[in-house]
Amino acid sequence: MPLPDTMFCAQQIHIPPELPDILKQFTKAAIRTQPADVLRWSAGYFSALSRGDPLPVKDRMEMPTATQKTDTGLTQGLLKVLHKQCHHKRYVELTDLEQKWKNLCLPKEKFKALLQLDPCENKIKWINFLALGCSMLGGSLNTALKHLCEILTDDPEGGPARIPFKTFSYVYRYLARLDSDVSPLETESYLASLKENIDARKNGMIGLSDFFFPKRKLLESIENSEDVGH
């Protein structure tokens, strides 16, 4: 015989005072992050919250690119989330990193493909993984370094996106070493040319304007120089 439903009055139901704010913050986080699998992401969110770890939450909403119509691929925003969760460690265990990857609803196949660029066994240097992620976002070395600067910078969004030249040169050398089309001589020559400007400023920082030139601006510059020659 089924038990009768128990009736409770309002005075008997205790709602933790912090619950409304927790749910409010969770809802805002879900809207900003737009996870492909809400249940999986929610499990990762509350697991991180209970441990006091950085949450798997984007700083802002991202519009999916033409190759990411369902927003399930790696983006700069998701890579920045991983950086917030892992940057305090010099080396990250692959099992822990893979779990964080899954919590962001990213395909396991893409995680494996990324690691195949520079195979390792149980753990990876975080800055190396971040560099590999940036290379997956951008086709060229300079585009990958652009993503790196925008993720690591302390400058406000839309600013010069400056990072220490020491970090920039380490990542450039690391990615160039994995690219068979770039010789060590070309790498060192390029970094030396950048370092001249950095040393002149005496702040040890490099920003996007020092090395990244969008194609449109480059074409305009070429056209202007041709006009001057006529």
From Swiss-Prot:
Q: Does the keyword Oxidoreductase apply?
A: no
Key words of the record = Cell projection, Cilium, Flagellum, Ubl conjugation
The known PTMs are summarized as: Sumoylated, sumoylation decreases upon spermatozoa capacitation conditions.
GO BP term, pick one: sperm capacitation
Signal peptide coordinates = none
Q: Which GO terms describe its cellular component?
A: cilium; cytoplasm; extracellular region; intracellular membrane-bounded organelle; motile cilium; nucleoplasm; radial spoke
| Location of the RIIa domain | 17-46
- Subunit relationships: Component of the axonemal radial spoke complex 1 (RS1), at least composed of spoke head proteins RSPH1, RSPH3, RSPH9 and the cilia-specific component RSPH4A or sperm-specific component RSPH6A, spoke stalk proteins RSPH14, DNAJB13, DYDC1, ROPN1L and NME5, and the anchor protein IQUB. Interacts with FSCB; the interaction increases upon spermatozoa capacitation conditions. May interact with AKAP3. Interacts with CFAP61.
Q: What does this protein do?
A: Functions as part of axonemal radial spoke complexes that play an important part in the motility of sperm and cilia. Important for male fertility. With ROPN1, involved in fibrous sheath integrity and sperm motility, plays a role in PKA-dependent signaling processes required for spermatozoa capacitation.
Q: What is this protein called?
A: Ropporin-1-like protein
Question: From which source organism is this entry?
Answer: Homo sapiens
